[in-house]
């Protein structure tokens, strides 16, 4: 039996991954802030071990990760949040909230799990295709996910000689409680079940970078390669489609 560690396991992609891996017989360490949801996951599958902590509480995160109920070989860092800035009116408090979860929270978990990592392990970090192209109102979210992507790629360079692999995941729009809050068109949005399938398949293949859905993420990457003066017009047209 193999084991997987998942943060952000109380909703969305993380919850679906926890359920899917548990169905396949994996031992799952499901992490999140919502203790009742974690307990319900354990009720559904005895091989799901709940671990409650808040990634923004860095000492608490380190303490929670000091001893684990099993030894994972796969680590999926999925916890994150999204807030938007309206009309380009900078809000440093909002920026700090988003970065504290999406960037420093990832770093806190990495610091906590690092003593448990060894040769043959894989760490997957969930970013966003938003890091590849500037999108309206995404000053905080997009910048945080760009930072996460850089962090993951740098860790890949430093950890590969140690036999530890890193996968950076770049999802497009996925139907989750997080995207339910969006008030704009979300082209080519996919279900959380499909997103979990894409992630599991990509990690099983051992890819270093995983983009999905392919058509949408390819389009975003293509737009990101165009001259900047064209990008804004095309992005606004795409998000109104």
Predicted features and spans:
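Residue(s) in the substrate-gating loop at a strand-loop-helix junction
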Residues: 128
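Substrate-binding pocket helix/loop in short-chain dehydrogenase/reductase
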Residues: 86-97
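Rossmann-fold cofactor-recognition segment
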Residues: 45-59
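Conserved glycine-rich Rossmann-like NAD(P)H-binding loop of the short-chain dehydrogenase/reductase
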Residues: 24-40
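Conserved glycine-rich cofactor-binding loop
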Residues: 10-11
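C-terminal helical subdomain
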Residues: 168, 184-219
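Active-site helix of classical SDR
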Residues: 110, 144
